[in-house]
Swiss-Prot record:
Coiled-coil regions, chain positions: 300-367
UniProt KW keywords: Coiled coil, Lipid transport, Lipid-binding, Transport
Protein name as it appears in the record: Oxysterol-binding protein-related protein 1C
Family: Belongs to the OSBP family.
Entry's Gene Ontology BP terms: lipid transport
Length: 814
């Protein structure tokens, strides 16, 4: 609304006004001076219309001032016509259109999309006062409607009318009707947008900024009526730019100069002219100030509504997470499946709705990013006979359950290795951990060189980055199965298992908020795990940039790679982009390669710290098939995060399989191309499990380590004597932290970091890694062999004691 469209006179009862002069003869109409060729509507108000006793505008002030069509000019307090406003500075009379379309409200049945399992569900929608509310019409929370409750509202649709008639015949007290009219959800049209579907003439959607409602009317005409009503209500809210709000009042003097000259020519006294000018200036100034204030209040209200919506979502997520945790602790897997599969009477509609995959634009390239949670909990998937459960973790330690469709000979792979007894808990802490504030740490180090600031060990977990590389191989049985499938000529199942393995490496990052130790230059880590049928070795090969290289020998396969991270700090978050290629080579000669996706860590300063992985991962090589995996980025209020969607294509580009799941739970697949719009629900019965995350330890550690991660830093009997002096298990600060000796851990960490600052000089003098070398014509590192042979001989002559103490006179030469 333009600020000049509501010009009015000052109240006769203002105590600050001077005495009224004698009445003057009426002035001629000078509307033509403002470029208007027609008579314009008058805009007047009395004292009672202008302000209430608290100094606020009346509710209907704007409409009563803007669209009064009974006179043509603005009059002053003397009854004289002062000016007529041009049409360009007034908004169109949309209230007339709104009254014609909306009246006192709109009501009726619309079908709301819930999820793939429940589909379209009827809801009773009511549009009133700029708010679209909806109610359930079935179940204990259903709404009761009648001609009395819907009095004054325009009811849309034959089915809606029949429902009112049916409820009216059954009868019901007015009080009971009001008690049942508690909305199940609300949408404020002020901050929403409405869009019609192009593919279905009965469907439309409403986007609120935080969620999308997909709705379907009975007929095409009903949709048109609803959309027109919604749009008309939206048009009722004025849209004004800051430049319009802050328009200077000095323009008023320029605009009235012509009238001033004409009035002087007509013989009007100078006192009367000045009085009119003062009245207009005062009114314009007061109105402009009020509009600016109202605009500010409007934005504050919108921000408050958005904040309340976010807090509501967070609270609902907390309740759902707590319910799931209690169910996991006290119920069997089957009961948990029933809990998450069936919609209950008290279940929130917003927990079940994730939008229509045909309309959501999560991924333009692949058409749809379907809701994994809703898919796995749908009734059609549940009844497929696959036996898969939708609980977050399997009930055993190795994650081999619920694989009834897998060949028994394949299923047994990974289970026939010798058993090795490993620890299940970290040692009990010796000391009580001190609470450390990040803010206090920043305050204590103001003005210092941050590169020389030693972060306390309270921000670390008792693992190094070298050990974290091996943690990605927790589900190495997937590679064993991939090798066996390839031997049998099933290349499709081979790449599907490799893709599941590539995703499984991210599962251990969920809930891990502490950073691993940064290895020293030349630090190594070995993992001889006969219970997994593999041997792993890694080494830090470069300090600037920090590069870690690794190599692993498995059953029928070899895996190697190097990793370097490029970080971007965004204030409240940090983005980590991996640089490097991971290579998998099977003994039959087939090679597959891929790179990791982007990882971001959020809420570094305030809020709950969490990480997310997103981007596209492509698995390609000499194989018959290639795979593309899309990790969906988590939004701030996403209720179903961590989704992964992938497709497997042959050399001709045809999609032969579709993968879906969550990187912290499980991955499933169906054969054929099911990534198109709406296709997923048609092929639920053929879904098969590829991988499921292992169950977390019974006694969770403060670091949220997995069962597998707890074993990585363990010194089993006789192992210490066989390790080189560079192994991460022998690093003192890391060992002290694991034992809960925090003071000693901090002391040792400071000592080692001071020593590590000499690593750049070592590297500049031509230092080379002991067990890895650069490939020719590439920046990648390959294992050159010899480690396990040296381990057998116990010969570590060339390995420096990088963790030992160095006297000041034995410091590295600068």
């Amino acid at each position: 609304m333009h600020p000049f469209c509501c010009v009015t006179t000052v109240s006769d009862h203002s105590p600050s006004m001077p005495p009224l002069p004698e009445p003057q003869p009426p002035l001629p109409n000078y509307a033509a001076d403002f470029g208007s060729a027609r008579s314009e509507p008058i805009i007047t108000r009395s004292a009672s219309q202008s302000y209430n006793h608290s100094g606020q505008f009346n509710n209907n002030l704007i409409h009563s001032l803007s669209f009064n069509h009974h006179q043509s000019d603005v009059t002053d307090r003397l009854g004289q016509r002062v000016l007529a406003l041009p049409a360009a500075v007034r908004e169109p009379p949309v209230d007339v259109k709104i009254n014609d379309i909306v009246g006192n409200g709109i009501a009726g049945i619309l079908y709301k999309w819930v999820n793939y399992g429940r589909g379209w569900r009827p809801r009773w929608f009511v549009l009133q006062d700029g708010v679209l509310s909806y109610y359930k019409i079935h179940g204990p929370d259903k709404i009761f409607v009648s001609p009395e409750t819907e009095k004054g509202s325009k009811v849309i649709g034959d089915e809606s009318a029949r429902m009112i008639s049916r409820h009216n015949r059954r009868g019901g007290s007015s009080s009971s009707c009001q008690l049942r009219r508690k909305p199940f959800g609300e949408v404020h049209l002020k901050v929403s947008s409405v869009r019609e579907s192009r593919s279905d003439d009965k469907r439309f959607s409403i986007f609120t900024g935080t969620k999308r409602l997909h709705l379907r009317a009975e007929t095409r005409e009903d949709r048109t009526t609803w959309v027109e009503a919604l749009q008309a209500v939206k048009d009722m809210f004025p849209r004004m730019s800051n430049s319009e709000l802050m328009a200077p009042t000095n323009n008023l003097a320029m605009s009235t100069e012509k009238i001033r000259l004409r009035l002087i020519e007509e013989g009007v006294s100078e006192l009367a002219i000045q009085d009119c000018e003062q009245i207009m200036k005062s009114e314009f100034s007061a109105l402009q100030s009020q509009l600016v204030l109202l605009k500010q209040k409007q934005w504050l209200l919108i921000d408050t509504l958005r904040q309340l919506e976010t807090e509501k979502v967070d609270l609902e997520n907390t309740v759902v997470d707590e319910s799931q945790r209690q169910a996991d602790n006290g119920c069997s897997g089957e009961l948990r499946h029933e809990k998450f599969s069936e919609g209950t009477a008290t279940e929130s509609d917003d927990d079940n709705e994730r939008g229509d995959a045909a309309e959501e634009e999560f991924d333009e390239e692949e058409n749809t990013f379907f809701d994994t949670r809703d898919f796995l909990s749908s009734s059609s998937f549940k009844s497929s006979g696959s036996g898969f459960r939708t609980s977050s973790f399997s009930s055993d330690e190795d994650g081999f359950e619920s694989e009834d469709d897998i060949d028994p000979s394949i299923k047994s792979i990974g289970c026939n290795y010798p058993r090795v007894k490993r620890r299940k808990n970290l040692p009990d802490p010796v000391e009580k951990e001190k609470s450390v504030s990040l803010w206090s740490m920043i305050k204590d180090n103001i003005g210092k060189d941050l590169t020389k600031v030693c972060l306390p060990v309270y921000f670390n977990e008792p693992l190094s980055s070298l050990q974290k590389c091996f943690e990605d191989l927790e589900y190495s049985y997937l590679l064993d199965r991939a090798f066996e499938y390839g031997k049998r000529g099933n290349s499709l199942m081979r790449i599907l298992n490799v893709a599941a393995f590539a995703v499984s490496g991210y599962a251990s990052t969920e809930g891990r908020i502490c950073k691993p130790f940064n290895p020293l230059l030349g630090e190594t880590y070995e993992a001889d795990y006969p219970d997994k049928g593999l041997r792993f070795f890694s080494e830090k090969v470069s300090h600037h940039p920090m590069v870690v290289a690794c190599h692993c020998d498995g059953t029928g396969w070899k895996f190697w790679g190097d990793s370097n991270l490029r970080s971007k700090f965004w204030g409240r978050s940090i983005q980590l982009d991996p640089v490097g290629v991971l290579t998998l080579q099977f003994d039959d000669g087939e090679i597959l390669q891929w790179s990791k996706v982007t990882t971001s860590i959020y809420n570094l300063i305030l809020g709950k710290l969490y990480c997310d992985h997103y981007g596209t991962m492509r698995i390609e090589g000499s194989a018959e098939y290639s795979c593309k995996l899309k990790f969906k980025e988590q939004s701030i209020i996403d209720r179903n995060p961590h989704q992964v969607h992938g497709i497997v294509q042959n050399k001709s580009g045809k999609t032969v399989a579709t993968m879906f799941g969550k990187w912290d739970e499980s991955i499933h697949f169906v054969t054929g191309d099911c990534s198109g719009k709406g296709k997923l629900s048609e092929d639920m019965s053929g879904a098969q499990l590829l991988w499921k995350r292992s169950k977390p330890p019974g006694n969770a550690t403060k670091y949220n380590l997995t069962r597998f991660a707890i074993t990585l830093n363990e010194l089993t009997p006789g192992l210490k004597e066989r390790l080189p002096p560079t192994d991460s298990r022998l690093r003192p600060d890391q060992r002290y932290l694991e034992n809960g000796e925090f003071e000693m851990a901090n002391t040792e960490k400071l000592r080692l970091e001071q020593r590590q600052r000499q690593a750049r000089k070592m590297q500049e003098r031509g230092w080379k890694p002991r067990w890895f070398m650069k490939e020719k014509g590439s920046e990648s590192y390959r294992y050159k062999g010899g480690y396990w042979e040296a381990r057998e001989d116990g010969s570590w002559v060339d390995c420096p004691d990088i963790f030992g103490h160095i006297d000041s006179d034995q410091q590295m030469i600068e």
